[in-house]
Amino acid sequence: MGGAARLSAPQALVLWAALGAAAHIGPAPDPEDWWSYKENLQGNFVPGPPFWGLVNAAWSLCAVGKRQSPVDVELKRVLYDPFLPPLRLSTGGEKLRGTLYNTGRHVSFLPASRPVVNVSGGPLLYSHRLSELRLLFGARDGAGSEHQINHEGFSAEVQLIHFNQELYGNLSAASRGPNGLAILSLFVNVAGSSNPFLSRLLNRDTITRISYKNDAYFLQDLSLELLFPESFGFITYQGSLSTPPCSETVTWILIDRALNITSLQMHSLRLLSQNPPSQIFQSLSGNGRPLQPLAHRALRGNRDPRHPERRCRGPNYRLHVDGGPHGR
């Protein structure tokens, strides 16, 4: 194919019309921020996933990359790796605090500079520092996660985005270099109970503070270890950012036991707007990239697929927090 992505005829027509219209209405959009999950926002064209790699040369991997994310994980393709160590979380024994944002694309929690939260272990050879917690969700139950397991989606997906602090000084630099990023994904179902960490983020007093784009609310005294199941396995593969520039420098770690939130909490998420209050309401839901080909990439897991009936037992299937296995 060469170095450039080839447009289909419909894509070329849409892009030509959109760029022509943009030339006649107001200032040009910021090329580093001109993207969306939906092509049509209030009658204006904004590049959706099929166009990400076509409108900005720096995003070309979105169109031509061979290690893109998200993917559909077929469990029969997962290779059992008994040498994968448990995941380790370091918080320095302190509670997490930070700011919950409605970015117009995601519900995003940005931790404060202190305490520093690090993850290591599993497939990671380096310590990675937490930079963002991102929540993706759908307009209907069972169709909100980016990744799928055996062709089945989940209602939401929580992504913990980390950068390699041993090799890079920040997330931006790490996203451009090898072994730069690690993203832990936890899947979410709608049920009668709720994960205790997500309950802090999604209770009525909190979630109504970020109803519109650019709204923010400060939270503190959060115990990040409560986000994780008491015991779990994980699947890992090499992939990319699932947003522009789609850099192929991510080690993905998918936790194989889903979390729960209530139907009321999910409804509250769907009432969040991707626009400011001065503009028409458009739900934040449906904020995920479509599946990408897995191709010949390896999927590794720490559970033996030959014995799927066996429960995760022992310290290798627990999150190790500040030096020891976490239990509730």
Curated annotation (Swiss-Prot):
GO molecular function, one term: zinc ion binding
Pfam families referenced in this protein's UniProt entry, alphabetically: Carb_anhydrase (PF00194)
Protein's cellular compartments: Secreted
Parts of the chain that traverse the membrane: none
Gene Ontology cellular-component annotations: basolateral plasma membrane; extracellular region
Glycosylated residues, chain numbering: 118
PANTHER family: CARBONIC ANHYDRASE, CARBONIC ANHYDRASE-RELATED PROTEIN 11
Name of the protein this chain belongs to: Carbonic anhydrase-related protein 11
The organism of origin for this protein: Mus musculus (Mouse)
Lineage: Eukaryota, Metazoa, Chordata, Craniata, Vertebrata
